[in-house]
C-alpha cells in the first residue's frame, strides 16, 4: 500500500507541475492583455454595451477585445484551479467561489495583479516541486525512501518550503 500511495503522490507532483505550466502561461497572457485596461465591478456592464455597439456596426474601444479574451482565460483558469473539471455535482455557488479565487475582469487592475502575481508564484512552486520529485526519484527511488542521511524527499520538501515561503510575513 505504501508504494502505491508513494506512486500516487509522485504522479500528483508531476500532474501539478504540468498544470502549473499552462496556468502560468495563461496568467501572464491575462496580465499582458489587461495591462493598461481599466476594469472593475462595472466591467460586465461596459462589455455588454460594447457588444451591442459592435452588433450594430459601431466601433468600440479595442480594450474590450482584450477584456473578452481575458474573460475566456479566466474561465480556463477556473477549470485549472478545479483540477481540470468542474464535475457533475458542482453547484453554481461552488463555481462562483472558485472564480473568486482567481483573477477576474471585475477586479481592480491593482487587486487583479496581486492575485496574478501570487498565482504565478504558486505555479512556479508547483513546477519546482515537480522537478525536485523527479530528481529525487531518479537518484533515490521512491519519495518516501530515505537517502544516505536518513531523510526522505518529504523531509527535504518541508525544509525547503519553510526556507522558501510563497508569502513573506509582514514585519
Predicted regions and their residues:
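A sequence/structure-level signal for intrinsically flexible, low-complexity segments enriched in small
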Residues: 1-171
Amino acid at each position: 500500500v505504501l508504494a502505491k500511495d508513494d506512486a500516487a503522490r509522485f504522479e500528483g507532483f508531476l500532474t501539478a507541475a504540468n498544470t502549473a505550466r499552462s496556468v502560468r502561461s495563461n496568467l501572464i497572457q491575462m496580465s499582458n492583455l489587461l495591462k493598461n485596461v481599466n476594469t472593475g465591478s462595472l466591467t460586465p456592464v461596459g462589455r455588454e454595451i460594447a457588444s451591442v455597439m459592435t452588433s450594430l456596426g459601431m466601433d468600440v474601444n479595442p480594450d474590450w477585445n482584450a477584456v473578452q479574451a481575458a474573460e475566456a482565460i479566466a474561465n480556463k483558469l477556473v477549470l485549472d484551479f478545479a483540477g481540470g473539471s468542474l464535475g457533475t455535482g458542482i453547484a453554481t455557488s461552488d463555481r462562483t467561489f472558485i472564480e473568486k479565487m482567481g483573477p477576474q475582469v471585475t477586479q481592480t487592475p491593482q487587486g487583479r495583479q496581486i492575485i496574478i502575481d501570487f498565482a504565478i508564484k504558486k505555479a512556479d512552486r508547483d513546477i519546482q516541486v515537480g522537478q525536485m520529485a523527479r530528481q529525487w526519484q531518479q537518484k533515490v527511488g521512491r519519495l518516501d525512501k530515505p537517502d544516505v542521511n536518513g531523510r526522505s524527499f518529504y523531509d527535504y520538501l518541508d525544509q525547503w518550503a519553510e526556507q522558501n515561503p510563497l508569502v513573506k510575513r509582514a514585519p
